[in-house]
Amino acid sequence: LRKDSIMLKKKQAYTVAILGATGAVGKESLEILEERNFPIETLRLFSSKRSAGDVLSCQGKECKVEELTEASSFAGVDIAFVSATDTISRDYGARLGAAGVVVIDDSAIFRMDPDVPLVVPEVNAAALRSMKRGIVAIPNCTTTPLVMALKPLRDIAGIKRVVVTTFQSVSGTGSAAMDELVDQTKALMAFQDVKVQVYPYQIAFNLLPQVGSFGDGGDCSEEVKIVQETRKILEMPSLRVTATTVRVPVLRCHSEAINVELERPLKANDARAALAMGLGSDVVPADKLLESANGVIRAERASGQYLKDRER
C-alpha cells in the first residue's frame, strides 16, 4: 500500500454510518448490508429533518434516523456511505475522509478527482490501494455494467472504440420518480389527466431521450459521465466512447446496448468465453434468453419490494 493511502483497519465489527438513509439508495444499502451479514457493531443513520425520527431495521435491530446537521458528530465511525445530494457529499465527504473515516460516496462530486479512486471491484479493485483523501467514489449506475462488460474484451483483444445506448429506469432519479411513474400509469389507465413534476414531460408510456441536463456540446450530463468515467476506470484516457442515454418507463433495472470495435481480431466464441469468465457476468445464448432465470431480470424481481411497500 502507498504510504499516503488511508485504509480501513481490520476489526471484528465496524461502526457504520449511512448519510441519506431514507432515500432509495440508502435503503438499498441497508438491505445489502443485511443480506451479506456485514459485521456491524453500531449503525448510525442520517437524513434530512423531514425523515429524522423514522425507525429503520437492519440485521434484526431497529435504528432511529438522526437529522444530519453541521453539528452532527461522527466520532468512532469507521465507514460512511454517503448517498444523499451532491451538496451533502461535498460538505461531509471530505470532512469525514480527513477525519480517518472510509467514505464510500455515491455522488458525482469526487468521481473525476485524481486523488479519489473510482472503483468497480470486478474491474479495478487495485485502485483502492491509493486513497489519499479517504474517499472511494462509486461510478454512475450505467458506467458500472459497461466497464464490467468491456474489461474481459480489452484484456484479450484491446478496445478501439465503444458506442453505447442506455435504457434507464426511473429508479435512477429516486423514489419520487418511481412514485410519479406509478401514479401517471394509474391515471392514464383510468383516462385521467397526469401530473408532471419530476421529469420535464410525462414518463408513463413514453421515452425521454435525455438523462440529466444538456451541455454546450449537445451531450446530456449522463452521457458525459459515461465517457469520462469509463476512461478513468479502464485507465484509457484517449478511448473513443460515444454514449446515448434514454429514460424509459420502467421502475427498476437499466439496460444497455454496447457496440465495441476491437484492436485485434477476436472470434465470437472466444468473446463469449471471455465474457463468461468476467466477474459478475452471465452469458446467455440468444435462443435461451427468455427461458433463463438470469437472462432477463423479471419485473417482480426488480420492482416487487417497491410495489409491496406502495400497497402498505
Regions found by a protein language model. Give the residues of each.
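Generic short amphipathic/hydrophobic targeting helices enriched at N-termini
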Residues: 2-3, 293
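N-terminal Rossmann-like NAD(P) cofactor-binding subdomain of oxidoreductases
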Residues: 3-203, 239-240, 264, 268-269, ...
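A broad, low-specificity signal for short, low-complexity segments enriched in glycine/proline
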Residues: 40-45, 101, 204, 214-223, ...
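Histidine- and/or cysteine-centered catalytic micro-motif in compact active-site loops
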Residues: 48, 167, 208-212, 244-246, ...
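Oxyanion-binding "anion nests"
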Residues: 204-252, 257
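C-terminal active-site/capping subdomain that shapes the small-molecule cofactor and substrate pocket
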Residues: 239-312
